[in-house]
A protein has these predicted regions:
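Hydrophobic faces of well-ordered beta-strands that scaffold small-molecule active sites
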Residues: 14-18, 43-45, 91-95, 120-122, ...
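Glycine-rich phosphate-binding active-site loops on the catalytic face of alpha/beta enzymes
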Residues: 41-51, 117-121, 126-129, 171-177, ...
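N-terminal amphipathic alpha-helix/helix-capping segment at the start of soluble metabolic enzymes
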Residues: 1-18, 81-85, 256
Length: 257
């Protein structure tokens, strides 16, 4: 069992997404620790990119603030290495293929292993092109996380059969952001996934309330929340950690209930 799968072994997982360097890395570190102390089972860390095509305005804004603040991939690597001294839950990077290519794919992925990153999510990487990264990820023991959006049963089955770490089920087509209602038939997608793999699956995109998180975790193995956390960070800045702590606790309590 990979370290990522182990995060799902003790019940439903809560997975927060946090953009590195928004508003600064010191605050990011405090937010990560606050999330873990209040029940986060796995942390998704966003490496900012100037053209984040999967993101809505909230996370796009976080990317731009971090980039304006001088964030770089190397600074994030050094930051994670330091964070790993006391943060023991699995951590994955979410970024874009161009970030990995421009750094050098093997150098990027081997550094992930060296600093304690357990997986990599590339939302702009089509399933058909994953072989560009998969052999290197396997060589260095970094899970390449598959995303499944609402699509045909055959395609869901195909992606699920080859998945590793966990499967990120996208709740609805479009970009990230909070939604008042999620209308996709996610239970059917999860059923197809489970017929094809034992790899756990978590649902993300659009989840912001404890009620939504519970509903998604009841269907799947966990809930992923990004924009709602980024909104707290944008609103409270360096005071965000205490607010994120409270929010994560409410979400984790909901999915446990």
């Amino acid at each position: 069992m990979s370290k990522i799968q182990d995060a799902f072994a003790h019940g439903k997982a809560f997975i927060p997404f946090i953009t590195c360097g928004d508003p600064d890395l010191e605050t990011t570190a405090k937010v990560v620790r606050a999330a873990v102390e209040n029940g986060a089972d796995l942390i998704e860390l966003g490496i900012p990119f100037s053209d984040p095509t999967a993101e809505g305005p909230v996370i796009q804004g976080a990317n731009l603030r971090a980039l304006r603040g001088g964030i770089t991939t190397d600074k994030i690597f050094a930051f994670v290495k330091e964070l790993r001294r006391d943060v023991k839950v699995p951590m994955v990077f979410m970024t874009y293929a161009n970030v990995v290519f421009s750094y050098g794919a093997e150098k990027f992925i081997s550094t992930c292993r060296d600093i304690g990153i357990d997986g990599l999510i590339l939302p702009d990487l089509p399933y058909e092109e994953k072989e560009e990264f998969l052999p290197t990820c396997r060589q260095y023991g970094v899970d390449l996380i598959s995303l499944i959006a609402p699509t045909s049963e055959n395609r869901i089955s195909m992606i699920a059969r080859e998945a590793e770490g966990f499967i990120y089920i996208v709740s609805s087509l479009g970009v990230t952001g909070t939604r008042s209602e999620i209308k996709t038939d996610l239970a059917s997608i999860v059923n197809v996934v489970r017929e094809n793999t034992k790899v756990p699956c978590a649902i993300g995109f659009g989840i912001s309330t404890p009620e939504q998180a519970k509903k998604m975790a009841d269907i799947s193995d966990g809930a992923i929340v990004g924009s709602a956390i980024i909104e707290l960070i944008e609103k409270y800045g360096t005071d965000a950690p205490e607010h994120v702590a409270e929010y994560v606790k409410s979400m984790k309590d909901a999915i446990r209930s």
